[in-house]
Amino acid sequence: MKEATKYIHAGAEPDPSTGAIMTPIYQTSTYVQEAPGKNKGYEYARSQNPTRTALEKAFAEIENAKYGLAFSSGVAATDAVIKLLAPGDEVVCGNDMYGGTYRLFTKVFEKFGIKFIYVDTTNISSISKAITGKTKLVWLETPTNPLMNITDIAAVAAITKPENILLAVDNTFASPYLQNPIDLGADIVMHSVTKYLGGHSDVIQGSLMMNSLELRDKLYFIQKSCGAVPGPMDCFLVLRGIKTLHVRMKAHCENGAKIAHWLRKHPKIGKVFWPGFEDHPGYTIAKKQMRDFGGMLSFVLKNDSVEEAMRVLSSTKLFSLAESLGGVESLINHPASMTHASIPKEERIKNGLTDSLIRLSVGIEDADDLIDDLATAIG
């Protein structure tokens, strides 16, 4: 089945009682049972909800997985994965990850005896060297947020599989339209569904996809026991958003490429971080494991001035200064003070995330209008 067809029909079945083509919003907290223990597959909405069931089926289908689980946020989905571990276990992860993930790892889970080892995951040997007998999980972002670094998922899977180490990939920046980590050997795929899957900046949600039934059952137990589940209205909004994923992502990619190339030629721009440049260190891998290069990019001004960066951030009109990404509207962001503020400055600087870095989530407006907006702001 072609991608466009898959996204439109994923998780979709006409409502058996009415024939409604769209999954109904089952806005209920509980379900009537015929007798104790005798129900119609649903007993309490924290455990199951028909709208969520349809969405979880869609999640699996769009990532070429067997199972999907929906969570109340991307961080909640990440939280569930780490709860598979025990005190003394170790996790190898990237040194330029999303700030919210870093905060969860360092401020929440380290005190429970789980050790997180941060390495440059673009260097596969760095991952190999960091693995010990206590390593239970490798956590990847690719492309990374916000420096757009690329990690070879298949190469990492070749290391983790023989050692029975779980490989989880945060696929938020790519979306299933561009990359399917399970096809490349990942055990778990995580999405901040808030971003491209929702696509309209109107829902907070996360997801996990996997092929292993044993892994699915463990994660479902955590999902239902800890209760970080989305409501049916949120599930409905994401079901609707997924139907246009292919149309939106094509436009994101086209606009992203135009803006990346325009920025690179601008005399006031120092460096542009975007994996579609042929001289990007991860270009060859990105071309192999991704279908296109996406609508996310970052840049620094040539003078590397924090003051000038702040002026640009406050001067755009079409690019809204805001957290998040992946919506139809374009956003501009200052990672050092916004999405990655929880990472200590010395760690950020060491890993290349400077105070002057600007991140763009390129929307699906007319590319020329977006370029005009940036041109005016940059000056």
Please name every model-derived segment.
Residues H9, Y67-K268, F273:
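Conserved PLP-enzyme active-site core in the AAT-like
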